[in-house]
């Protein structure tokens, strides 16, 4: 008959600590012995100060004789715990001058150290061993190398540092769980695999390393699943009607596995992948890759990132096969990525730019209709967003009238059109509009794709998103609260204002009756029994008008933003993208603009002095020209793109009467004049006249007016 009866383990408390808890990681294995009518935690027995292992392993309890256990329990019953003030404190601090005694759980609560080696010494919270505190060279938190949750890199009771790797930090609980699973033969530093130094330090700091084989070595067919390939779509929203397990090679329903872990997969169609894309990584692997690269080289974050590959994809869930972070932990980490890493937006976009291939695609753009030209080129089946882009400007139907153009200038013109197009509404901070013609032509998807391509290929930042639109993209519509500022329709805004300003229930019901049809069709009609109901009614109308009403355009817009993995980066680093999607770049100062230009060849000292004086005069408002005008004249862009100018800006002084700009090379030639007045006059005249002519050249663009549904107007 087996003396250990697990079924009774809950009825008998441990004879030492008087707790029923069965927690092997904290107290060791709990065993109940029916023959002697007691239960005991392994660690409580092992750490008791007045008992020694006098029997063989198979005798008594773990080699401790039963009579010795009873004597130790009797001895402990006379000792009061320093923590809980109850009797039974069988463990005492090993320091001779210290008189503290405690139960094992109380000692753990007070952060005592129990050494599972040699004489199994116990140290109270005053005399416990500590790790040396070195100078903290880390400006922010670092991840625990086991669970990847962030810790402050300062050694404490709960945070331990590896003795052999300065960058390896651990939670105490994570180390203990790993030690129990790995055993003495496989427990080692997670970074350098050192065993001797690492185990010695961990034993000193109270980590129990059992003398057993690793748990995975004892499991039958532990590695059997490694022989199987993963053929399941793990994307959050699988669009395959035949289910996640359906896999049809050489079709859009072929399952592509993560190139790094192989334990997550996606249908090509579910992640908007094309057949020409060979690589795909799941969200877990991409997050680890970028975290590792950023931690290793904060000054040069791109130096070791050549293997990074990002593709269009939905936000995936972790594969159920991998024991990684919990869903809650992943969600928290996702929301705090920006604040933890403080990643610069240029670094993120440059990483996305690693996908761009050397193979080029030439876009033929009519300056008089940039929008329609770009739309035709991007909708072409041969267009590949991961190819490098060359731009050639054509002049209508004039044969032979074409010249090489600046890609960044083209993208700048395209962003200007998108900002003022019919797919957005609002004055400065814009939301998506409801445009039936745009839905029919799939323009919301195309606009999203254009924005993504512009950001990755070095174009300017949009800067016109409303905070509500951005929050919908980054955190989801369900976590977004629209405001009255998001309502650009005057009639709807008046309804909301009337309801919100109602001072009694009769006035509120009168307003509801007046706009009954609109409230009913929009799904916002509700029974109002008190004046306070108006707040929920206003909230419902705002959510319907700003979010639910444009649900289909929003989903299409999101699909477009998934191009080149941009949407996923927005959701991973919302803080970084908020600055470029919702805010225009700050105005350039004279010094900032001057610093953008590199002096080319030998410069004329006087001309450079005139140039700096000219910039200063513009900054002081003494010229009709602006800093933005100079930037447009030299590059075609009204602001500095998030990834900077490629090629970098250069300035040259030549013996010419008027300034000359080469936007393809971002090169500016300054005129050589005898006086500053002549220099300023020539610069002002040329820049303003050139910009005026270019504006006239682009004046014949696609009309903006695409009306909303007449049914909605009738309802309002």
From Swiss-Prot:
BP GO annotations: apoptotic process; blastocyst development; negative regulation of intrinsic apoptotic signaling pathway; protein polyubiquitination
Reaction equations catalysed: S-ubiquitinyl-[E2 ubiquitin-conjugating enzyme]-L-cysteine + [acceptor protein]-L-lysine = [E2 ubiquitin-conjugating enzyme]-L-cysteine + N(6)-ubiquitinyl-[acceptor protein]-L-lysine
InterPro entries per UniProt: EPHD, HECT_dom, Hect_E3_ubiquitin_ligase, PHD-type_Zinc_Finger, PHF7/G2E3_ePHD, PHF7/G2E3_PHD, Zinc_finger_PHD-type_CS, Znf_FYVE_PHD
GO molecular function: ubiquitin protein ligase activity; zinc ion binding
Domain of life assignment: Eukaryota
PROSITE patterns xrefs: EPHD, HECT, ZF_PHD_1
CC per GO annotation: cytoplasm; nucleolus
SUPFAM superfamilies in the cross-refs: FYVE/PHD zinc finger (SSF57903), Hect, E3 ligase catalytic domain (SSF56204)
EC number: 2.3.2.26
Zinc finger (C2HC pre-PHD-type): 11-51
Zn finger spans (PHD-type): 79-128, 141-195, 237-286
Pathway annotation from the record: Protein modification; protein ubiquitination
Keywords from the UniProt entry: Apoptosis, Cytoplasm, Developmental protein, Metal-binding, Nucleus, Repeat, Transferase, Ubl conjugation pathway, Zinc, Zinc-finger
Domain HECT: 369-696
Disruption phenotype: Embryos die prior to implantation due to massive apoptosis resulting in blastocyst involution.
Subcellular location per the Swiss-Prot or TrEMBL entry: Nucleus, Nucleolus; Cytoplasm
Disulfide topology: none
Expression across tissues: In the developing embryo, expressed predominantly in the central nervous system and early limb bud. In the adult, highest expression in Purkinje cell bodies and cells lining the ductus deferens.
Xref: PANTHER family: G2_M PHASE-SPECIFIC E3 UBIQUITIN-PROTEIN LIGASE, PHD FINGER PROTEIN
Record note on domains: Ubiquitin ligase activity is mediated by two distinct domains, PHD-type zinc fingers 2 and 3. The use of these distinct domains may allow ubiquitination of different targets by each domain. The HECT domain is catalytically inactive and does not contribute to this activity.
Role this protein plays: E3 ubiquitin-protein ligase which accepts ubiquitin from an E2 ubiquitin-conjugating enzyme in the form of a thioester and then directly transfers the ubiquitin to targeted substrates. Required for prevention of apoptotic death in early embryogenesis.
Name used for this protein in its record: G2/M phase-specific E3 ubiquitin-protein ligase
Organism: Mus musculus (Mouse)
Gene symbol of the encoding locus: G2e3
């Amino acid at each position: 008959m087996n003396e250990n009866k697990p079924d009774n383990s809950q009825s008998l408390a441990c004879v030492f600590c008087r707790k029923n808890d069965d927690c092997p990681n904290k107290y060791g294995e709990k065993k109940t012995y029916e023959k002697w009518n007691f239960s005991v935690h392994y660690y409580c027995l092992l750490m008791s100060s007045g008992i020694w292992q006098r029997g063989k392993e198979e005798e008594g309890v773990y080699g401790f004789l039963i009579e010795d256990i009873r004597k130790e329990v009797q001895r402990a019953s006379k000792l009061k715990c320093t923590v809980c003030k109850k009797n039974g404190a069988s463990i005492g601090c090993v320091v001779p001058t210290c008189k503290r005694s405690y139960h094992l759980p109380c000692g753990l609560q007070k952060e005592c150290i129990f050494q599972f080696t040699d004489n199994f010494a116990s140290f109270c919270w005053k005399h416990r061993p500590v790790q040396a505190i070195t100078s903290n060279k880390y400006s922010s938190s670092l991840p625990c190398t086991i669970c990847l949750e962030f810790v402050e890199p300062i050694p404490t009771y709960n945070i331990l540092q590896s003795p052999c790797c300065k960058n390896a930090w651990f939670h105490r609980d994570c180390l203990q769980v790993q030690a129990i699973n790995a055993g003495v033969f496989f427990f080692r530093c997670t970074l350098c695999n050192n065993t001797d130094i690492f185990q010695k330090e961990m034993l000193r700091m109270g980590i129990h390393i059992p003398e057993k084989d690793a748990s995975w070595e004892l499991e039958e067919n532990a590695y059997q699943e490694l022989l199987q390939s993963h053929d399941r779509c793990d994307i959050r929203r699988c669009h395959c009607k035949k289910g996640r397990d359906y896999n049809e090679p050489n079709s859009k329903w072929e399952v592509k596995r993560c190139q790094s872990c192989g334990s997550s997969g996606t249908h090509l169609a579910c992640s908007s992948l094309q057949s020409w894309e060979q690589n795909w990584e799941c969200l877990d692997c991409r997050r680890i890759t970028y975290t590792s690269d950023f931690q290793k080289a904060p000054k040069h974050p791109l130096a070791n990132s050549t293997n990074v590959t990002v593709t269009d994809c939905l936000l995936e869930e972790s594969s159920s096969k991998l024991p990684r972070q919990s869903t809650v932990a992943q969600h928290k980490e996702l929301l705090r990525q920006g604040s933890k890493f403080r990643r610069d937006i240029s670094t993120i976009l440059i990483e996305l730019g690693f996908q761009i291939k050397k193979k080029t695609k030439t876009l033929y753009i009519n300056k008089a209709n940039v929008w329609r030209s770009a739309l035709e080129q991007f909708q072409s089946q041969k267009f590949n967003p991961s190819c490098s882009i060359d731009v050639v400007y054509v002049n209508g139907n004039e044969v032979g009238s074409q010249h090489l153009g600046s890609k960044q200038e083209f993208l700048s013109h395209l962003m200007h059109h998108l900002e003022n197009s019919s797919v957005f509404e609002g004055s400065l901070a814009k939301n998506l509009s409801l445009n039936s013609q745009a839905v029919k032509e799939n323009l919301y998807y195309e606009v999203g794709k254009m924005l993504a391509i512009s950001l990755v290929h070095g174009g300017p930042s949009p800067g016109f998103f409303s905070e509500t639109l951005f929050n919908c993209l980054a955190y989801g519509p369900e976590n977004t609260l629209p405001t009255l500022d998001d309502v650009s329709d005057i009639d709807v805004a008046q309804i909301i204002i009337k309801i919100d300003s109602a001072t009694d229930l009769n006035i509120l019901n009168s307003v509801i009756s007046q706009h009954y049809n609109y409230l009913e069709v929009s799904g916002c009609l509700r029974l109002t029994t008190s004046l306070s109901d108006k707040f929920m009614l206003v909230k419902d109308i705002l959510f319907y008008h700003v979010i639910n009403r444009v649900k289909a355009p929003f989903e299409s817009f999101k699909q477009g933003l998934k191009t080149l993995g941009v949407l996923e980066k927005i959701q991973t680093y919302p803080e970084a993208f908020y600055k470029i999607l919702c805010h225009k770049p700050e105005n350039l100062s004279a010094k900032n603009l001057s610093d953008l230009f590199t002096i080319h060849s030998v410069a004329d000292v006087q001309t450079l002095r005139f140039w700096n004086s000219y910039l200063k005069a513009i900054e002081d408002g003494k010229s009709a020209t602006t800093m933005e005008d100079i930037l447009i004249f030299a590059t075609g862009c009204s602001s500095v793109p998030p990834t900077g100018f490629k090629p970098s800006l250069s300035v040259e002084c030549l013996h010419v009467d008027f300034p000359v700009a080469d936007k393809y090379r971002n090169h500016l030639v300054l005129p050589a004049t005898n006086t500053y007045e002549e220099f300023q006059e020539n610069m002002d005249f040329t820049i303003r006249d050139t910009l005026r002519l270019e504006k006239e050249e682009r004046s014949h663009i696609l009309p903006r007016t695409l009306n909303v549904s007449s049914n909605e107007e009738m309802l309002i």
